[in-house]
């Protein structure tokens, strides 16, 4: 029987494309694929705050004060996320798409893990808003706490169970009646997309994707093993990354009052 081990580069290309596409499609965070550190190494991420005043100056005069910048650094350990799967030569003969489907499933699991890490970082938000009930008013109040002049990049993510709260809201119904909602998006509030996800349970977030950043190595590592006797092929997919709350000014946590 022919050896059906795939070229590592082929699997790597498939996994890289799927992983990057699925993370970006969520539009939850900024993706930076320039990470150079290895798993277990530390990367320090600094959050900067600039303070200063623009002054009018007459001819020959200078500023009365200077601007300054401060920063808080936090160390993050680079993670290794790995998925492994096996297939036999006989499996491939029965269905030659089995490896493609396994790569797709493996990268989806890896993506879900990164989503969990995103939620962990989002929970570190320093600005919060507590509402008696969740609905139009709660979202509007949270948006005001983000305090952005340009709200075009804002979006809201909510627990799947909270969709009913919004859909029953009279203000929402008046604004959205008759419209069709597609692909998991609940709709918009004040022109801002509201997205429901099972990754959240008891809190929502109003944010831009600048709040959380995913630092990920550009290349997906692929390793394979083969047991010639049983014709079993093992495939390992690995990716190194860090998920970090990088801009706490761009996110507000919303909770329901107990």
Residue ranges and their predicted role:
Residues 1-71, 213-223, 228-230, 234, ...:
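N-terminal "assembly arms/tails" that initiate or stabilize quaternary assembly
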Residues 43, 137-229:
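Extended oligomerization regions of viral-like shell subunits
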Residues 53-56, 95, 165-167, 244-246:
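Short helix/loop capping segments that flank catalytic or ligand/cofactor-binding pockets
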Residues 70-79:
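Short glycine/proline-enriched loop/turn "hinge" motifs that connect secondary-structure elements
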Residues 82, 86-151, 253-258:
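Alpha-helical scaffold segments that mediate packing/assembly in large oligomeric complexes
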Residues 89, 158-160, 239:
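Short, structured patches in soluble enzyme cores that scaffold and shape functional sites
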Residues 226, 230-258:
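Extended, compositionally biased alpha-helical segments that mediate assembly or anchoring
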């Amino acid at each position: 029987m022919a050896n059906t081990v795939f070229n590592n580069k082929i699997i790597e290309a498939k996994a890289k494309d799927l992983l990057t596409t699925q993370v970006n499609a969520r539009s939850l965070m900024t993706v930076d694929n320039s990470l150079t550190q290895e798993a277990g190494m530390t990367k320090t991420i600094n959050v900067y705050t600039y303070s200063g005043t623009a002054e009018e100056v007459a001819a020959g005069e200078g500023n009365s004060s200077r601007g300054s910048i401060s920063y808080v650094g936090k160390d993050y350990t680079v993670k290794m996320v790995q998925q492994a799967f096996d297939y036999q030569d006989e499996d491939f003969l029965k269905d030659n798409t089995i490896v493609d489907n396994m790569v797709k499933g493996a990268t989806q699991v890896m993506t879900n893990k990164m989503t969990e890490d995103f939620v962990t970082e989002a929970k570190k938000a320093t600005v919060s808003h507590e509402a008696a009930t969740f609905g139009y008013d709660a979202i509007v109040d949270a948006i005001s706490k983000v305090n952005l002049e340009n709200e075009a990049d804002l979006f809201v993510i909510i627990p799947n169970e909270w969709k009913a709260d919004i859909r029953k809201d009279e203000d929402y119904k008046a604004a959205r009646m008759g419209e069709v909602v597609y692909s998991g998006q609940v709709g918009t509030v004040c022109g801002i997309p509201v997205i429901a996800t099972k990754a959240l349970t008891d809190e929502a977030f109003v944010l831009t994707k600048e709040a959380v950043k995913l630092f990920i190595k550009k290349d997906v590592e692929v390793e394979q093993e083969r047991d010639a006797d049983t014709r079993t092929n093992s495939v390992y997919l690995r990716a190194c990354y860090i998920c970090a709350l990088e801009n706490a000014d761009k996110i507000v946590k919303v909770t329901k009052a107990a």
